[in-house]
Amino acid sequence: MIGAPCVVDTRGTWHYRRKQMKKRVVVVGAGLCGSLLSTLLRNDFEVTIVEQGRTKRPLFNDVECKTGELNTSINRGEGLGGTSNYWHNALIELDDDDLEKAGIEPRGFAPYYAKAWSLFLAQAELDECARARDANRASVGGGTATVAHMVLPQTRHNMWKLANERYPGDSIKIVYGHAQKIAPGYVEVKGRNGVERLDADYVIASAGGLATPVLLARSLGQDDAFCAGYHDHPMAYIAKVKLRPDSRLKAASCTTTRSAEVRAGLTYKTAGLKTVIYLRPAIDMRLGSITGPARYILSDLRNDPFSPKKILMLLGNLEAVREAILFKTRQGFRGDYYSVLILGEQTPIKTRGIQLSPGKRPSLNWQVTAEELASYDRSVNAFFDEYASEIVERKALPSAEWTFRNAAHHSGTANQFVAAPGDTTPEFFRATGLPGTFVCDGSLLRAAGIANSGLTLVALGYRLADQMRSMA
């Protein structure tokens, strides 16, 4: 268990009875949302959290998917903290338009975004990032593109450890195993010693955008369900550019503060879909470093640092080595050469999602449609047109040769299991047909624009915790 030690104190019998009177919450999944929610609720409920395994390890074979490097890069994780064991949380808000598409009223949600920012950065650090944001918008804003504000903290946090540091309190029981089914009053968990029933007044499904819909479907007896509505942010390196020595794009691409990097994303909307463009440091105009499996080797090796194969790949991509040094030494981006990285918006469609089959692993279809590709291509051309005077030279891959990778934001797959009330009321989180069950992870998001979903999910965690305290 995690929390205050069991000692006899002046509270004595009263303290024991208070604990016995608490309602029981079972949280499935100890990743981003599950870790936060379990700590926020620990003093009001008797909290149990279910995590697949004790050992931190990536998951590569729990889902069938042949595209987008879904099963060759780390984007699902086992162990307390989930994928936060591997990834920095790049912090970016959904804009008002995207919040409304996601069923979230923007003004009422603003205080929860503020709480989410404060979980990761102190107020002085946030003020410094805000000054960089304003400078970026003054420098490169005002044209066709809107300027997205992304903050990448220097410190990578395991969410389980961070949440427990921020919100200590009563004990949390940890159960290791696979949640098999949610039923009225309990959760079935299969562990080393067989199937265990965990009594629950309330259940929070926070197993992640690929696992939560599978759990919900199987709990409802839908063993062959298709969980539609999946969307992510297809990402691809598509070009290299040489900028003018005095180009305003240089500072906006990366501003270094004492505790973070602030990166301005240039966002275009074409045919109803957004595309965001980020510039990353390069050495020259050769395209070899942004094609093939070595193009993301920096993040792949960071999460698997002892792989001989990946070490050799890194040594073959000096641009990745240089970028790592710039990040660690807080020098920002340097030089005239940059790679162009895009992330595209996907919207929920009926043919994209997770297919369940009895006795088999779930399979994911997340392909980029022809319409999406055409939209991204037009947005890239708009970027090159708008900033033509900043670019001395460019080499671009044709859109037919763009190789997309999944950005691991796995969203939208629980939409058929939850209502759409138009705001974050309890019904927004409540799983239909499973009394006392709530959903809080990427599977809940109906839209995400071009924003990494992590900050929004943390804000939703704070919102759900506020609502559940009234149920204690």
State what each model feature region is.
Residues K23-I49:
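N-terminal Rossmann-like FAD-binding beta1-loop-alpha1 element of flavoenzymes
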Residues I104-P184, E401-T403:
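Conserved redox-cofactor binding core of oxidoreductases
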Residues L36-T39, S206, P213, A217-F333:
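Mid-to-C-terminal "cap/lid" subdomains and adjacent gly/pro-rich loops that border
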Residues R42-D62:
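Glycine-rich FAD pyrophosphate-binding loop
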Residues F60-L126:
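Redox-cofactor-proximal catalytic regions of oxidoreductases
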